[in-house]
Amino acid sequence: MSDNAQLTGLCDRFRGFYPVVIDVETAGFNAKTDALLEIAAITLKMDEQGWLTPDTTLHFHVDPFEGANLQPEALAFNGIDPHNPLRGAVSEYDALHAIYKMVRKGMKDSNCNRAIMVAHNATFDHSFMMAASERASLKRNPFHPFVTFDTAALSGLALGQTVLSKACITAGIDFDGNQAHSALYDTERTAELFCEIVNRWKRLGGWPLPMAESDSDSDSDSEE
């Protein structure tokens, strides 16, 4: 059995990165000026055979930061009333502090050295999380500052679909459009989708990678 056949740990699979699925709901498209209203995070785990599955979930409704823009079109789209006291919203600091604490524990348990965001159209979610972290003065942000795993791009490659709902359906994952644009629901579906893409690549023989030819073998071949 090759050494690569033993690469079934999460840290081995993603070069030391610890993938965490994130989705946000916001009051606009500008991460610097528009409010972050909801965020969900799901960590992932890998079993002894190298199969990836969702693990731990955190979900928060978030109070708009002071002076935040609330675009009416965005609120109409996601159906969030930022001023509804029944939301049980917390500050950006409290939400991200709890998520980062969960992520750092997962990194330690998995022997990973950096978290990497998994998201659908990840640039959007990444920009809002980073802006909120800066506003909250959170110094120990475990996420890579710019590298992400974007399931829109991965789904386009693996499934021929880039829209979350269509990619899920193509992958055999149930998707309820009535629950879409909830950060929790979209994170759950994105986590299932990412795991399916990673596991499908394994089922097709793409992982572990074939062992590279050793230097000694290369030298002996060149002498023949």
UniProtKB/Swiss-Prot annotation:
Q: Could you tell me the keywords of this UniProt record?
A: Exonuclease, Hydrolase, Magnesium, Metal-binding, Nuclease, tRNA processing
Q: Which Pfam families match?
A: RNase_T
Gene Ontology CC: one annotated term: cytosol
Which residues of the sequence carry a binding annotation for Mg(2+) 1?
A: 23
Q: Can you name the source organism?
A: Enterobacter sp. (strain 638)
List cofactor names only.
Mg(2+)
Record's CDD domains?
A: RNaseT (cd06134)
Q: Where is this site: Important for substrate binding and specificity?
A: 29, 77, 124, 146
> Residues in domain Exonuclease?
20-194
Q: Which GO terms describe its biological process?
A: DNA replication proofreading; tRNA processing
Q: How does it assemble?
A: Homodimer.
| Function in brief | Trims short 3' overhangs of a variety of RNA species, leaving a one or two nucleotide 3' overhang. Responsible for the end-turnover of tRNA: specifically removes the terminal AMP residue from uncharged tRNA (tRNA-C-C-A). Also appears to be involved in tRNA biosynthesis.
Protein name (database record): Ribonuclease T
